[in-house]
């Protein structure tokens, strides 16, 4: 794997990364079961913080190529892609519950993943199997390395044949601490 990035003090950072490798069990007990099959990923990421408003924008988009056996049906995608953009806006910075540098943020995540890029060989129609999401949220950071977050996730999931999407929504609560 490898990553390269360019950073500008005002504009932010743009990076490109790649990773990959063999993912299947191609031998067992000295017997060759299959050839080595690879999965390879290329991703572009971006992050910046507005010096005027403190707004943070972070995003990533990835392309994936999977070596799927030709005998598998088209429901096993050989190409995938997806990404997200997170926008985080601090709305309150002050002492809260004894934490001197607490921050309350409004957040929004927009995301898309297509698990099977392409068209059906027989009909030429687009293969579905993709998810779109909009996730507004509220996060509290009592200290820089800890976050308590409440989101409402709005999701549209398309099946393989791109029938009308399953529409789901729900609250998510999370706590994370990085050290």
Give short role names for the model-derived ranges:
Residues 1-77:
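Surface-exposed beta-loop-beta
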Residues 1-3, 43-45, 84-86, 135, ...:
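Membrane-embedded beta-strand positions in outer-membrane beta-barrel channels/transporters
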Residues 8, 18-24, 50, 61-67, ...:
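Transmembrane beta-strands of outer-membrane beta-barrel pores
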Residues 9-14, 51-54, 92-104, 145:
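Short loop/turn motifs that connect adjacent beta-strands in outer-membrane beta-barrel proteins
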Residues 12-16, 55-59, 85, 104-108, ...:
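Transmembrane beta-strands of outer-membrane beta-barrel proteins
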Residues 25-27, 74, 88-141, 149:
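Outer membrane beta-barrel transmembrane domains
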Residues 38-42, 79-83, 130-134, 167-171:
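Residues that define the transmembrane beta-barrel architecture of outer-membrane proteins
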Residues 87, 166-179:
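Outer-membrane beta-barrel "beta-signal"
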